UniProtKB/Swiss-Prot annotation:
Name of the molecule in the record: GTPase Obg
First-level EC class: hydrolase
Binding site for GTP: 166-173, 191-195, 213-216, 283-286, 314-316
Taxonomic lineage: Bacteria, Pseudomonadati, Pseudomonadota, Gammaproteobacteria, Pasteurellales
PANTHER family in alphabetical order: DEVELOPMENTALLY REGULATED GTP-BINDING PROTEIN-RELATED (PTHR11702), MITOCHONDRIAL RIBOSOME-ASSOCIATED GTPASE 2 (PTHR11702:SF31)
Any one GO cellular component localisation term in the record: cytoplasm
Pfam families registered for this protein in UniProt: GTP1_OBG, MMR_HSR1
UniProt region (Disordered), positions on chain: 362-390
Organism: Mannheimia succiniciproducens (strain KCTC 0769BP / MBEL55E)
């Protein structure tokens, strides 16, 4: 199935049903008082994370989703039915963004997580709501409010513990194949990897971590060269980045310069991503002697001023990979995801009609604590005000 990590859809919550103006009319009860019911609320639109999905391709073809409208109120104090909600299933790791305001509505980082993205319109109030000691026969109602409408940008960001960085043909896909059961395409030409992929690296029966491989970066990627830098977003949730470097490039380029290119593109994309823990791993040491590999790695790190540890591996032969995998696992266990990052709630999103009813009732001086008896005297019309509203 084609991997799609971005989609723009139109979502429309249901409109609220209108309130009803009605009066109780029964034999021997000539003035039974108001009995108009409220309308029903409009249906909401939700997103729910589904671990069985791994692409947003479904939303490339069907782009408009609308919830049901609330039913109008009826006489005999009958409230209209609420509109049915709709729930859209998306992959775990999806972020919802309002395309007009660029407001992040929320992230779905756990299977089964549910997110309200468009709130249905509020129901209108029937004339029963406006009865009071001074208004015995109100002819007033409110209309249901329109449901929220949004152009929603969906962005899928893969959930992985380790992210792979490097130029094209640095050996990232070969590394994924070496440490996991994933089988990304491997070939001797640039940009063999066109879409991100995941692999599960298992250290032993009870310990494993997830590795994310993305297409390689080249100089000018931030300006659109190659496949650009848009796939870097898939590394934002990783705990550590593995910068894989070809220690003996076939084009005879300088590995130190290649490292500088990746770091520059990383900083241009996001300083937050650039500040993540980053490990330097020299690959393809099987193409040169061990002594030459050690000498080159030392020279490169000295020129870069790299003071951290680094690794020398061969993804093709598996040399030194078991030790690297164990060290990564130890780092992940020693640095669990921060609680605030794992359970971080999105900033409260203000929906359009949150305060609508309070405003409507306060404008009309309605006190919901007032009680009124239906058996009022026919002659007692003091203070009765008839309000006509279309």
């Amino acid at each position: 199935m084609k991997f799609i990590d971005e989609a723009l859809i139109r979502i429309e919550a249901g409109d609220g049903g209108n309130g009803c103006v009605s009066f109780r009319r029964e034999k021997y009860i000539p003035k039974g008082g108001p009995d108009g019911g409220d309308g029903g609320d409009g249906g909401d639109v939700y997103l729910i994370a589904d671990e069985n999905l791994n692409t947003l391709i479904d939303y490339r073809f069907e782009k408009r989703f609308a919830a049901e409208r609330g039913e109008n109120g009826r006489s005999s104090n009958c409230t209209g039915h609420r509109g049915k909600d709709i729930t859209l299933r998306v992959p775990v790791g999806t972020r919802a963004i309002d395309n007009d305001t660029k407001e992040i509505i929320g992230d779905l980082t756990k299977n089964g997580a549910k997110l309200l993205v468009a709130k249905g319109g509020y129901h209108g109030l029937g004339n029963t709501r406006f009865k009071s000691s001074v208004n015995r026969a109100p002819r007033q109602k409110t209309m249901g409010t329109p449901g929220e409408k949004r152009d929603l940008q969906l962005e899928l960001m893969l959930l992985a513990d380790v992210g792979m960085l490097g130029l094209p043909n640095a050996g990232k896909s070969t590394f994924i194949r070496a440490v996991s059961a994933a089988k990304p395409k491997v070939a001797d030409y640039p940009f063999t990897t066109l879409v991100p992929s995941l692999g599960v690296a298992r250290v032993d029966a009870n310990r494993s971590f997830v590795v994310a491989d993305i297409p390689g970066l080249i100089e000018g990627a931030s300006e659109g060269a190659g496949l650009g830098i848009r796939f870097l977003k898939h590394l934002e949730r990783c705990r550590v980045l593995i910068h894989l470097v070809d220690i003996a490039p076939i084009d005879e380029s300088d590995p130190a310069d290649n490292i500088g290119i990746i770091e520059s593109e990383l900083f241009q994309y996001s300083e937050k991503l650039a500040d993540k823990p980053r490990w330097l791993v020299f690959n393809k040491i099987d193409t040169i002697s061990d002594e030459e590999a050690a000498k080159r790695a030392k020279d490169i790190t000295e020129r870069l001023g790299w003071e951290e540890d680094y690794y020398l591996i061969s993804a093709a032969t598996g040399k030194n990979i078991p030790q690297l995998i164990r060290d990564i696992m130890d780092f992940i266990e020693a640095n669990p995801r921060e609680v605030e990052e794992e359970e971080k709630a999105a900033e409260e999103v203000k929906f359009k009609w949150d305060d609508y009813h309070n405003e409507q009732l306060s404008e009309r001086g309605f006190d919901d604590e007032e009680d009124w008896d239906d058996d009022w005297s026919e002659e007692d019309d003091e203070g009765v005000e008839f309000i006509y509203k279309p």
